[in-house]
């Protein structure tokens, strides 16, 4: 059988890069076999506290960047900046960042996390960093380790922000706009030491250990190689110059280790403050254990998905935490941002998906808190807009409100938001009457589709939102509204489909980003089936759009900007559609392509990475909150999903890697629109046993159990009764407790897994790299094709 790498990673060439610009590539040796794979060449990570107003960026090198400065590390004597690209998370998913830097026989193991001293997110955030130094050699050795603070790192682009860092400070005009704590650079700052701390203009920047005693110097070098002078003074250094250096020269016997602990207040503090005293006396292990307990306790409240691939499990867990760290509590407001870095802002489009993820993950109170902030973005005319021209916000809010009710059955919430729903629908009705196409008005979103005109996706969103407005009207007994909204929906949908039919007549069925413009980026035109089903999943327009967008993939994921950049989470619009359509193999292949493009800390990105190039997202930093929410929902929907509040679907998509004798899949505490779903699947050499323990508050019409495409099924029974199989699925009674499935794997079943996908990616990258070394080219048609 022909190798399927072409489907996973190599697609027809679709990268319209200026032919005069030679592509850049990295030496494949960047990836070490003894380290977990990390796709990004310049990964950024976060340590932070749920609901705090700011977070700390763990830089590609392993430094700690805040709005006020960057603590960096050095090894050797003279000191050389430490650089360690690959990092991991404690237990694989907790927001405790770990990495090991090896210098000859000395290992420097760095562990970092953030906490507030009193456990309240509104309090000052403190960063704890432990460096454990180990001599792995067979003879004594001296370890040289140093720390120092700088304002920022080097920049190789326009602007003052360092490479792979975020802009700071930033003061928003209104809550929800981009904000960053911090200060502007000031060359007149004074620097000095006070016992165990570096002071900048009289504020503590970081605390360092005094035992063993360090060598202190205000700068790494002296202009005349003189004796260091450590009296407090102005240094007039550059923003990139490290200051406040402490160096430790430690003799270690074979197998011996030494621990150093550093503490970094996210906001500099007065040296005589009670917070500094508390930070100095705080026991790192106590706060580490509190951090572990907090997140473990939160995780055990929600959905738990376990499959026989650790990368899948850890990515699922870690990305819930990434979104919770991205949330701010400001007064009584809970502001869901996208990350604590360059996207430290509120967007209706991102937040609506993140809220849906919280609801579907078993955190309705967290979802409700975030939803309460949406109301402030309703305009006087009734529309919902968080960024100018982005009218998809109307449908996203209606959908977010409706889905929250549908999964929680919270009537108090429905009553609270319904007046704003009425105003919103009134706006839609008037907007359609005034529009020449009787659709969502022409607009310039300035993002996503990047068109000016009637945006296809805005209409899919509006229809999906209107469906949820109808549901809210019905449950609240607003029958007159429900009838009027249904009539509006029917007319709107018919008008929209007629326009789609007209437009797609000349595009082989492909639904373009704009209905009355020829340019634009694929985005909302990929939403015909999910998150609300507007068109039949098998509609020819859905199929054509799916095929047309998949033809634009590079490295197995979607592209953006006419093929110039990879786009990570945009891919999942197709993955969700494939899951619903029953395109199981495509969905599994995309699952692994998505995972390949994460860091070793399971962070996703947005775009800006060039295909088959440097794997550098530049200033478009990870982790990305919309990726986080969409990945969790994509995996959840593969295993458990609703269809139109009527059917419950189980195991829509599973990987061949999971179907091994003795292995299993477990889904626990999964909220659905029907109630809580719990099941375990155990695989044998000739089939599977499924045990269910569901608690329905509203029974589904039936349960659809999907069967893998890579097996031949010989029989299915539910609670001892034979069940017919049709279209690779079995309809189960809603009270089913035990399902027995007999099958045999088909000959030549594909070997799909995360490890295989990484291996295939690395092999293809090396192949292109070797050609690039010889010819300077890695982007011609000879290297593409299906």
Where are these regions (language model features)?
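Active-site acid/base region of carbohydrate-active enzymes
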Residues: 198-223, 299-325, 348-349, 379, ...
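Aromatic-rich carbohydrate-recognition surfaces in CAZymes
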Residues: 135, 174-182, 187, 191, ...
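Bacterial N-terminal signal peptides that target proteins for export
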Residues: 1-9
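Bacterial N-terminal signal peptides
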Residues: 8-17
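Terminal accessory carbohydrate-recognition/targeting modules of carbohydrate-active enzymes
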Residues: 22-307, 644-786
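The feature captures the catalytic groove of carbohydrate-active enzymes
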Residues: 230-232, 239-284, 339-340, 383-392, ...
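An acidic-aromatic substrate-binding cleft motif
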Residues: 281-341
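Active-site core of glycosidic bond-cleaving carbohydrate-active enzymes
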Residues: 341-363, 370-380, 415, 419-422, ...
